[in-house]
Amino acid sequence: MKTKFLIPLILFIGLVVFLAIGLNRDPHEVPSPLINKAAPAFEIPQLADGSKMFSPANMKGQVWVLNVWASWCVACREEHPVLVELAKSQMAPVIGLDYKDKREDALAMLAKQGNPYLLSAFDGNGRVGIDYGVYGVPETYIIDKAGVIRFKHIGPLTMNLLNQKIYPMLTELKKS
C-alpha cells in the first residue's frame, strides 16, 4: 500500500526538480557543440555584390563577430541599433550572414536602418546556417584569430550584453 503512494511521490519530486533546474537556465545560453571548435568553412556570395565571395578564411588572424540576421526577422530589427554601436566601437569587424532572405529585402533594410557590417554574406538557402547550428535569427558568434568559435548568443544583442560579455571577451581575445 505504501509503495502505491511512494512511486508517484518520487516521480512527482523528480519532475519538480527537473523543471526547477530548467527554469534557472538562461534561454539564450544554449550549449553549442561548436564552442572552442573551428568555425565551419564556407564560401558564398556577398550580399551587396554577388560577384564577390566571402569565406571565414578571409578573416584569419583577426578576432571578428559573425551576426546571423534577416530582413524578415523582427528581433533583428530590434538588435540593429546595438550592432551599429558594436561596429562604431571598432572592437572587431562585424560580418553579417543574411539568412534565408531575399537579397533585395535585405539591401533595402540596410539602406533604411544603416549598415553595421563590414560586409554581409548571402545565405539565401540557409545551408551555412545549418552548418553553424542556427536555431533562429538573430544569432551572434565571436570567432578568434585562429578561426575558432569562442562565443555564441541566440537572440537579439543588448547594450548590457555588449558591455558585460562581448566587449570584455573581444578585448581578451585580441590580446592573445
Predicted regions and their residues:
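N-terminal targeting signals for export/organelle localization
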Residues: 1-45, 176
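Thiol/disulfide oxidoreductase modules built on the thioredoxin-like
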Residues: 5, 111-116, 123-174
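Short gly/ser/thr-rich secondary-structure transition/capping motifs
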Residues: 24-25, 45-51, 120-123
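Short pre-active-site segment immediately N-terminal to redox-active cysteine/selenocysteine motifs
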Residues: 38, 62-64, 68-72, 136
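A short beta-strand-turn-helix
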Residues: 42-65
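Hydrophobic beta-strand core positions in alpha/beta domains
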Residues: 65-67, 96, 142
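Structural microenvironment flanking redox-active thiols in thiol-disulfide oxidoreductases
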Residues: 77-114, 124-130
